[in-house]
């Protein structure tokens, strides 16, 4: 979030930046840390774009059950803002969200997004996204790395 804000705040064109955070603690931290940069153009919202029933729930990893419980609890603390943003087109979307929500978020955002930046590509949350983008003729891999948990950037062709 900070990197995006630093890159945008000196621009004078008509842009909009929205960061969504479902976790109340992360939302509070982000809002406090970025407080000086927030404006009509730069917003951090405590919200989500999918509902509980859209979360991945069939992970075979035992440790995932605790993470899923936490994600579901976080979802109960915030509102779904999809109806407020679904008619926008996004130049860039960074998918670095929840382990169990990212696939459903990607499916909603894919038709209205030009560039996806994916963090943690080797993890559950973005593995399936990478597979879909790699197999599609509508998307081109711009950059990828296997360092840490991996990242990738895809652009609509």
Please report, for each region that a protein language model flagged, where it lies by residue.
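S-adenosylmethionine/decaboxylated-SAM
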Residues: 1-157
